[in-house]
C-alpha cells in the first residue's frame, strides 16, 4: 500500500472533475498574469499556525491585521444585498430532485452571533507560546474556508430572545436554587448558563427534542459561545406547560480559572427576571442560570442569539424521522454550514422520549451516530472518528460532553484515531475506518434492529473530499443524503446528486445556517473541548459529569512501563513522516497521544495494494467518469507479513519501543483489528525507571480489561494541535488564586477596617501567591509579556474580536469566490 511519501510525486488529476479544477486554476493564473496591478492587494488565507518574528520572538505575529480589509470582504458586503441565486440541479442521468430551495435569511438574523468572553475587567498579561497566544489559538487555514477577525466591530443589538415574560402569575415557586414557571403555548424562554430542566406538565421543545411530563431531569448547557437553546411550549394543560429549572454545580464553570477561553461564557449578574424570582433571598444570591428577555439584559453585553430552527430544517427533520428505524442519512456540506447543529437536532428529535411521536414512531432502540468529522467531533476529542449509540437527548455544545465514557446518555461502540483534524492527511486510512464503523453499525442492528443511523461528514467536501463523499453515498446503503448549502457550488452538488441517483436515494438540499460571527474560532473550540475532556470525570453513582479545576500538572498520572518484564506499552507510533529514533523522546514528551488497543499481532496495514484515493499518473483526464471505487473489496489494503513486535526499533538512549512500518511515512494500524480507547497527555518520560507518566481520563478498569482480553496497547502520536492550554494552566490557576486572595483582603478592609487586612498571615500568603505566579510564568514553551505597549494592546483587542467565517470556492467556478 503506497503511503504519503509515494503520493507526493507529481501526478495527473484523478478524475474529470479534478481535471476541470486544474484547468480552471491554470486559467485563473493566466488571467492574473495579465491583470493590471491594483492598489489593494489580495491577501491569502492565514497560515495554519501563527509564527513569531525572528526579531521579536515573544510578540506573536498578527496576520489578522493585514487581512481585515480585503477585496473579498468588501465584495461580500455588496453581494449581501442581492438575492441569492439557487444552485442548478445536476442534469446528468436525471438525478433525483432536491427539496425546494429558498433564499438564505439575512445575516442579521444569525443564530450564533456571539461576543468574546474575558473574565477580568482588567487586562491580563499576554501569554505567548512558541506558536502564538496560548489559550487563544491562531486561526486555521482550511481547504474549504478560514476564519478571521471581523472587518469592523459588530455593535451590540437589543436582540429579542424570549417571547414569554415572567410575572407573579407565571411563577409557581422559586428560591435561591430553583424556579418553576408556567409557559403558555407558542411562547418561549431563553436562558444562559447551565441548569437541570424538569417538565412537570405539558410538552416543551428544546434543541429538536419534544419533552413530555416525566420524572426525567435533563442537564442543559447554554454558554455564550453558541446560540442559546430556546425552551418553547408546544402544548399544555389549559394552554400552559409547567417547567422547573434548577441550578447545577458540575464544576465546568471552574475551568475559567485554567483558561481565558472559558471566562465570561456563562451567566453574569442577575437580570430583571432573576430579581423577580429571587425576591426574599439575600442580595448576593445567584443561580447558575439567568433568564434573558433580550440580549440587552446580559450584563456582559455579549452578542447573544437564540437557536431557532429554519422552516426548511424543521420540515426535513420531520420527513427524515418518518423513516423510523430505516433511516440511514449522510449529512454533508461546506464548513460552517450547520451540519453539526442539524445532526444534533435530528438526533434529539429521534430520541424524544414520547410514548408515541407524531410520526407514529416508537423509539426503544436508540440512535446510532457515526461521526466522521475528526476536526469537530460531537462526543469525542479531536482526531477521532467513532460510532456512538445514544439513548437520551443531549443538550449542550461538544465541550459539555467530550466523552461518553460512563455516560447514561449513550456509549461509544467503537472509535478510531485518525491523528489529524482533517481526513485529507490520510484518506485511505480514513475510509477504512469509516468502513469498519459501518460494519459495527450493522452488527449493532442485530441487537437493535430499529436503530436509525445519522452520519456526520466533515466540511472536507471539495476535491478529494468530494470523491470520498460520493463513494460513501454509493457504498454505505443509505436512505437519504442531506447537503447543507443552497449556494452549491455546482462542482459539488452535481457529482453528489449523481451519486445519490445511482444509489437510488433522495438528495435534500437545505439552506446553510446563517452564521457570520462567532466568539470562538474552530481552533479555540477544539482547545476548549480538549481541556474539558481531560478535566471531566464521572464518579460512580453520579449520573452527570463533573469537572475538576486542578491543573493537569497536579493530577496523579498513570505510570506505565515501556520496557522490561512489566512492560505495558508494546509500541509507540508516530503518524506522518518518519523520524529518527533519537528524536522520539522529544517528539513524545509533552504531547497528546492516542491510546490504541491492538487486537492482533498483524495489525499494521501492508503495502501490497495501491491507495484508494490518491492521484494516479495514468488516470483519465477527460470524460465524465471519476475513479471507479464501487468494488470496495478490491480497494482494501492487505495486511502486511511483518508483526508489530518485529517492526519495533529500540531507541539507543531511552530504550523506547519505536514502531514504524512504511516507506517515508508511517503505515497506520488496521481499523479492523484495533480501536482507540481515548487520549493521554505524556507528562514525562522517566528513562531511569523505563516508565511513561500519562495523564488521561481513561479509567484503570478499561485498561485492565483490554490487557485481560490479550490485547496490547500502542501509543499513537498524531498531528493534533499542540496542548498549549495544558502548558498555561498553572499560570492561570496561580493568577486566579492571587485574585481570590486580593478580593478577600478588600472584603476584610470593607468589613473590619484596614488593620484586619494588614494581618501578617495574609501578607505572607500574598507573597507566596506572587511567588507561585512567578514560578508558573517560567515554564518552557511559554512567555508572559507584561508590558502595555501598543502592539500588546492591539493583540488584546484582537482577542476580544468576533470571528468571521469565510468560505472559498474554486477559482473560475460557477460559484461566488467568497460565499
Curated annotation (Swiss-Prot):
Bias kind Basic and acidic residues: ranges: 76-94, 101-112
Compartments (UniProt record): Nucleus, Nucleolus
GO CC, alphabetical: nucleolus
Amino-acid positions noted as binding ATP in the UniProt annotation, renumbered to this chain: 333-340
GO biological process, alphabetically ordered: cleavage in ITS2 between 5.8S rRNA and LSU-rRNA of tricistronic rRNA transcript (SSU-rRNA, 5.8S rRNA, LSU-rRNA); rRNA processing
GO MF annotations, alphabetized: ATP binding; polynucleotide 5'-hydroxyl-kinase activity
Ranges of biased composition (kind: Acidic residues): 115-125
SUPFAM superfamilies: P-loop containing nucleoside triphosphate hydrolases
Matching Gene3D superfamilies: P-loop containing nucleotide triphosphate hydrolases (3.40.50.300)
E.C. numbers: 2.7.1.-
Ranges of compositional bias, category Low complexity: 8-42
Coiled coil regions, renumbered to chain: none
Renumbered residue ranges of the record's region Disordered: 1-129
UniProt keyword list: ATP-binding, Kinase, Nucleotide-binding, Nucleus, rRNA processing, Transferase
Family indicated by similarity: Belongs to the Clp1 family. NOL9/GRC3 subfamily.
Stated role: Polynucleotide 5'-kinase involved in rRNA processing.
Name of the protein: Polynucleotide 5'-hydroxyl-kinase grc3
